[in-house]
UniProtKB/Swiss-Prot annotation:
Protein known as: Putative nuclease HARBI1
Amino acids binding a divalent metal cation: D149, D199, D225, E261
Cofactor: a divalent metal cation
KW Protease (keyword) present: no
PANTHER family assigned: NUCLEASE HARBI1-RELATED, PTHR22930
Subunit record text: Interacts with NAIF1.
Organism: Rattus norvegicus
Record-listed E.C. numbers: 3.1.-.-
Domain DDE Tnp4 residues, every copy: 148-300
Amino acid sequence: MAIPITVLDCDLLLYGRGHRTLDRFKLDDVTDEYLMSMYGFPRQFIYYLVELLGASLSRPTQRSRAISPETQILAALGFYTSGSFQTRMGDAIGISQASMSRCVANVTEALVERASQFIHFPADEAAIQSLKDEFYGLAGMPGVIGAVDCIHVAIKAPNAEDLSYVNRKGLHSLNCLVVCDIRGALMTVETSWPGSLQDCAVLQQSSLSSQFETGMPKDSWLLGDSSFFLHTWLLTPLHIPETPAEYRYNRAHSATHSVIEKTLRTLCCRFRCLDGSKGALQYSPEKSSHIILACCVLHNISLEHGMDVWSSPVTGPIEQPPEGEDEQMESLDLEADRIRQELILTHFS
């Protein structure tokens, strides 16, 4: 069980009680529009987070100068959604950038501790069948239980000698593996892979691969793009379709797989700390991976609370390292190829 951490308000220690603090900032004193513009979430959602994370962010104390869970959560949300520790964000709640940084660290760890509660594949057969039905209704692709893709998130260089995080654009990044359902809910998130790894290598070494290699529901597949190799449990598009049925398969595959592309764009637009618009995450790879995962947890909680996650403006494709020619090669897995051809003949001929 994680030990709750009490964060002290350094501004109070420096300036005394006359300095405005978040304990004097009341959510009920500001409008919903203000909360959305500054922190990206509505009032009731913030109250829910206070209830969910409060025990991890505070403990009984005689100190009067501890920053409240509410303060810490607002500071973290402000960073996640804006991507910076800008002065106006701290001023809005009466804390310094240093205090904001500590708040972000604590809220991030509290969310990461709860990741498995909000990010997981459904366990029962009825839920699995529901996934298949929903994906099939999108473009007629049978047996799909999730769409998978990778996304690079820029981080600061760990050190001059470590090149494992340098991606094909020559920038340092984490390559994150994500699986979503048709609603955009995240069912698998792995955020710690170094940016030098190609998508197919990330998948090969992932917990997701181990999970599906050891067993999966019958006639169930993930959909991946051409950066992945074909597997018995992962359907990829045909590199060179020849027959009408193969073209129909590729069109259905593309239309269905687009849900993960849309989800990743939306995730980065909602959480600007991920999109690089304010620069790379200025943390170690481990801390950066936790921040990414925390944003993913918030994304899923938003969906559970009925928030319209698609309403964030999406400006276009996320800039990512270029794919190499080797990523367009077909797998030599003969059994996987047989399964795909059988599916094409059965459902697209």
